């Protein structure tokens, strides 16, 4: 389906993702988003009452959060290490797809108004909470040691986020001799040894 055939809401979201990725939240205007979406600015505001709500919907639609929610039913029945590897693989894939958005958000996040910082924090907290619930569920089944599941979720995603940032955003080739599968396998092995009973 071409952009012109997409429903208005989806067209606005796709255009917003593209412009936020190119110009950042601060640089992209609702006037520009509506024009490039082929709608009047008033139409944009009918779908998204504020620029903040539009940004929140872009994060909710195009980041790892919907992917994580979608894979959890399958991941919850996988063996532990396989489940961790699947989460990591999908996380890295999503980060690569959204590389430009991540780069621009890193460069301007210190300038964001509190409302936008709050949106980012709630999105990250929900993602970490889902993963923490996964660890808690596995612990209740007797598979894992007792540990702070929220910190473990942050550590787990943080390892792979740092791998992505150093290699894809900063351009350091510290792990140049490793492909994604090797990094995922190595990180998961280390992480699972620290958390498994």
Task: Describe the predicted segments one by one.
Residues 117, 139-187:
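Hydrophobic/aromatic-rich alpha-helical bundle segments in the mid-to-C-terminal region
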Residues 96-130, 177:
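Short secondary-structure transition hinges
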Residues 1-23, 27-39, 53:
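Basic, helix-initiating cap at the start of DNA-binding domains
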Residues 56-87, 130, 136-139:
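Amphipathic alpha-helical linker/stalk segments
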Residues 9-10, 30, 52, 77, ...:
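Short, structured helix-loop boundary elements
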Residues 13, 81, 85-89, 128-136, ...:
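An amphipathic alpha-helix signature
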Residues 60-63, 82-107, 157-164, 193, ...:
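Helical hydrophobic small-molecule/effector-binding pocket
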Residues 38-48:
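Short hydrophobic/aromatic patch on the recognition helix
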């Amino acid at each position: 389906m071409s952009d012109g055939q997409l429903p208005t809401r989806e067209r606005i979201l796709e255009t917003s993702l593209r412009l936020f990725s190119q110009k950042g939240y601060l640089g992209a205007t609702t006037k520009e988003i509506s024009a490039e979406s082929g709608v009047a600015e008033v139409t944009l505001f009918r779908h998204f009452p504020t620029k903040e709500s539009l940004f929140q919907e872009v994060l909710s639609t195009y980041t790892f959060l919907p992917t994580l929610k979608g894979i959890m039913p399958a991941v919850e029945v996988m063996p532990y290490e396989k489940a961790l590897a699947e989460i990591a693989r999908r996380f890295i894939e999503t980060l690569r797809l959204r590389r430009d958005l991540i780069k621009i958000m890193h460069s301007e996040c210190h300038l964001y108004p509190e409302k936008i910082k709050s949106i980012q924090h709630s999105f990250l907290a929900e993602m970490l909470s889902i993963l923490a619930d996964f660890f808690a569920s596995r612990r209740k089944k007797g598979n894992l040691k007792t540990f702070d599941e929220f910190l473990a979720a942050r550590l787990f995603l943080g390892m792979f986020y740092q791998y992505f940032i150093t290699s894809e955003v900063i351009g350091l080739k510290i792990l140049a001799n490793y492909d994604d599968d090797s990094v995922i396998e190595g990180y998961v092995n280390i992480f699972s040894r620290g958390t498994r009973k």
